[in-house]
UniProtKB/Swiss-Prot annotation:
Native source organism of the sequence: Haloquadratum walsbyi (strain DSM 16790 / HBSQ001)
UniProt KW Ribonucleoprotein keyword: yes
Protein's UniProt name: Ribosome biogenesis protein Nop10
Pfam families: Nop10p
Entries under InterPro entries matching the protein: H/ACA_rnp_Nop10, H/ACA_rnp_Nop10_sf, Nop10_arc-typ
Role of this protein: Involved in ribosome biogenesis; more specifically in 18S rRNA pseudouridylation and in cleavage of pre-rRNA.
Length: 60
């Protein structure tokens, strides 16, 4: 699922805090915005098995 909320791509350089918007450009500095959604799940993740095993051990 893709998020409609976008963030200013250069907010660290131009703003004190993140600027969120629905537009394709930042309303404050007119720079390009990017999607705020996390990276998609990758089933070929080489370390996924180890991460899941560690998470399960922590739960027990």
């Amino acid at each position: 699922m893709k998020s409609n909320i976008k963030i200013c791509a250069s907010w660290q350089k131009k703003h004190e805090q993140p600027v969120y918007t629905l537009a394709d450009t930042c309303p404050k500095c007119n720079s390009v915005t990017k999607n705020t959604a996390p990276a998609p799940f990758d089933p070929t993740d080489a370390y996924g098995e180890y991460r899941r095993a560690l998470k399960q051990r922590v739960r027990e």
